[in-house]
Amino acid sequence: MKKIEYSGVCDMNGELIPYGAPLDFTWWAMGMGGEVELHLVAKIRKRKSGDIFEFIKDDRGRDCHFTHRLTSLNWCSDDLELLK
């Protein structure tokens, strides 16, 4: 049985997030009409140089791929929800 390794980050419900688990990442962006709430699917990946968010689906459910360091984005636990 594979051991689950946790990232040390909690989601909006206080649950620890395992590495590689899909998350609903709420991203707040500025649009023409003001603030827009986008929901992207991301995973947390472990890297020697620091953990990253790996985004795998955009707000329309289309496949995408881009990464950001956890420390380079303005986010909080309320922006993350573990997808079951």
Regions found by a protein language model. Name each.
Residues M1-K84:
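Secondary-structure transition motif
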